[in-house]
C-alpha cells in the first residue's frame, strides 16, 4: 500500500525535497505575507514584552500544515532578540528529555514544540508547572528513596504548534496566553509569496506566471514554494529567463497539478465515485478498498481539500460528489433525489 502523501506535489506536509524552502522563508513580521490580524497582534505583544524586558507570554499556533507556524515561531524569537530552540512532540519521549531542554534555556528564550498535541501525558504533567511557575518538579530515585526536587527555570516563552487543536488537553491549551489561528492564504497573498520567492531564487517572474502558480497552490505557502522550484526547473531547461503563464501552465500540467490545484490522486478519488458509484453516496471503507488506501489517509489527506473546494460532501449516508465536481471532471451529473444528499438520512455508520 502506497504512502499517499510521500510523493504528492501538492501535499501540505513537509517533504524530503523541501530543504530548499528555508531560503524562501521571511525573516521578519514585516516580510511575512498574509495572516494580517495575527501578525498585527503578534507585533503588539512582542513590542510590549520587549519594552517591559519580560518573556513573551506562551504562544499557540493552530492551523493546517504548511501555513507558516514554524516560520512565525522563528520570527518571534528574532523580533524579541532572544535564543531559539526547536523540537517536536514525538521527539520528547520522557520527562527527562523535556527537563534537559528547559534547563538549558536562557532568560526570555523561545522554545518551539511542533506537533505539541503529540506530547505524552507524563511529559505534559512536567510541562504544566514549567509554563505556569517556571519550575520543574521532578522525582529523583525510586521506591522509599524517591524524593521530589524543585528546579527554578529561566523565564521563557513556549511556542507550540498544532494542526489538531482538538487533541490538546484543556489544561495544556489553557496555559497558552496567546492563541493564534492561521488560515489558508488568498490567491493575491500567494502571488506575493511566489514573486518574492522568485526574487530570492534569482529567476524572472511575470505577474501572470505568479498568478498561475498561486492558483494551484491550494492556499498553502509551502506548496507554492515547492511548485515554484519545480517550475523554475522547467524554465531553466527551456532556457527561459522569465516564468510566464505559458511556462507555468506547461510545467504544472506535466506535474499533473490541474488549474484547481488537484493532482492525480484527487482526480482518481473523484472519478472513482463518479464512474463507479454514480456520484455517491458511498462509504469511506468502500472507497478505501476501491483505492487501496487506508481509511485515515483518505480522511486526513485526500478529502479535506476536496471538501474545502466544494467538490465533496460528507453525509450521514457516505461521500457524495457535488455538481461542482462533475463540472470539473467534465462529466454529466446523474439524476439524484434529495435523499441521496443525506437530507433525510438517519444512518450515521458510513460503512
Curated annotation (Swiss-Prot):
Gene, per the UniProt record: ruvB
Region (Small ATPAse domain (RuvB-S)) residue spans: 186-256
Catalytic reactions of this protein: ATP + H2O = ADP + phosphate + H(+)
Role this protein plays: The RuvA-RuvB-RuvC complex processes Holliday junction (HJ) DNA during genetic recombination and DNA repair, while the RuvA-RuvB complex plays an important role in the rescue of blocked DNA replication forks via replication fork reversal (RFR). RuvA specifically binds to HJ cruciform DNA, conferring on it an open structure. The RuvB hexamer acts as an ATP-dependent pump, pulling dsDNA into and through the RuvAB complex. RuvB forms 2 homohexamers on either side of HJ DNA bound by 1 or 2 RuvA tetramers; 4 subunits per hexamer contact DNA at a time.
The record's note on its domains: Has 3 domains, the large (RuvB-L) and small ATPase (RuvB-S) domains and the C-terminal head (RuvB-H) domain. The head domain binds DNA, while the ATPase domains jointly bind ATP, ADP or are empty depending on the state of the subunit in the translocation cycle. During a single DNA translocation step the structure of each domain remains the same, but their relative positions change.
Gene3D superfamilies xref list: 1.10.8.60, P-loop containing nucleotide triphosphate hydrolases, Winged helix-like DNA-binding domain superfamily/Winged helix DNA-binding domain
Segments of this protein annotated with the region Head domain (RuvB-H): 259-351
One GO BP annotation of this record: DNA repair
A single Gene Ontology CC term: cytoplasm
Residues that bind ATP: 24-25, 66, 69-71, 132-134, 175, 185, 222
Keywords associated with the record: ATP-binding, Cytoplasm, DNA damage, DNA recombination, DNA repair, DNA-binding, Hydrolase, Nucleotide-binding
Annotated family: Belongs to the RuvB family.
Localization (cell): Cytoplasm
InterPro entries in the cross-refs: AAA+_ATPase (IPR003593), AAA_lid_4 (IPR041445), DNA_helicase_Holl-junc_RuvB (IPR004605), P-loop_NTPase (IPR027417), RuvB-like_N (IPR008824), RuvB_C (IPR008823), WH-like_DNA-bd_sf (IPR036388), WH_DNA-bd_sf (IPR036390)
Residue numbers binding DNA: 295, 314, 319
GO function term, MF aspect, one: ATP hydrolysis activity
Region (Large ATPase domain (RuvB-L)) residue spans: 2-185
Protein name as it appears in the record: Holliday junction branch migration complex subunit RuvB
SMART domains associated with the record: AAA
Subunit structure: Homohexamer. Forms an RuvA(8)-RuvB(12)-Holliday junction (HJ) complex. HJ DNA is sandwiched between 2 RuvA tetramers; dsDNA enters through RuvA and exits via RuvB. An RuvB hexamer assembles on each DNA strand where it exits the tetramer. Each RuvB hexamer is contacted by two RuvA subunits (via domain III) on 2 adjacent RuvB subunits; this complex drives branch migration. In the full resolvosome a probable DNA-RuvA(4)-RuvB(12)-RuvC(2) complex forms which resolves the HJ.
Residues annotated as binding Mg(2+): 70
Region (Disordered): 1-22
HAMAP family per UniProt: DNA_HJ_migration_RuvB (MF_00016)
Enzyme Commission number(s) from the entry: 3.6.4.-
NCBIfam families, alphabetized: PRK00080.1, ruvB
